[in-house]
Amino acid sequence: MKGCKMPLKHILGADHVVITVRDLDAAAAQWRKLGFTLSPRGTHSPQMGSGNYTIMFGEDYLELLGVLHETEQNKPTREFLKNREGIERTAFTTDDAAAGAADLAARGLVPLGPVHFGRPVDLPNGGKSEAKFNVFRWPLSESPGGMRIFACQHLTRNTVWIPELQKHANGASRIVAIEILAADPRGAAEHMSRLIDEPPSVADGVFRVHSGGKRADFVFYDAAGFAKRYPDAVRAGAAPEGAAALVIGTSDLAAATKALGTTGIAHHGMVSAPASAANGTVVSFVAQ
């Protein structure tokens, strides 16, 4: 019926955040210094042309992503890296990539995919397996606040959520928020809301859109709001616009503070690693 839109019943909340970097191994070393346990380095299927390290939590995770060779699939990532490193995109969990892409098409959007790919996995017991995925992307023009979004169907969760990789010296347990710097935070939040069917809210001039379920929030700031939230020393090296910060829940804030050492800056009830220490991304820890 004209004027109606299909519900996005196959989008289940934020799945993982992609931090795109120029030197994958150097980035891994930086994030280990923040107290994270990283997976062994992975190499995606040839058509993707990328490699990664993952930082696994309870239901979500971070992905450090690097380009290994040029392909059509990684062209947007290469364009992103011409300007900066940092949070390039966020994935949502989908239980059916084909159906999710069809839901977008029913709304008049042109999804990219689904695309099937995988990567070999070295298991803690010395064995080998494979992680397999189906993904689809919203059109590149639909990037709220400058952050691309896509959806990921995990076909082999047991080769991604490995218990030994979910234990971190900093106590990290989940992604609480993905924070986005936008000239028009209200407009960016409303854009995200339209794309994922989650209502926006506002408090003290800060706009928020929940990603779904018990997963992370997207929080949108203008430059003044971002400067109020983070001291100058924390914002050093952060992106001037787009996704700029992560808030990570920790079961032990003292452990997170210890893991960060002299890199950490305590403020507003949290402890933050400056963007200069995390590939252009402010990484903050809050007690959960």
Label every model-predicted segment.
Residues K2-A14, I19-S39, F57-F117, L123-Q288:
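Glyoxalase I/VOC metalloenzyme domain signal
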Residues L38-P46:
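Conserved catalytic-core motifs of GNAT/GCN5-like acyltransferases
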Residues S45, G118-R119:
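Conserved beta-strand edge residues that scaffold enzyme active sites
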Residues Q47-G49, G269:
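Short acidic/glycine-enriched loop/turn segments that link adjacent beta-strands
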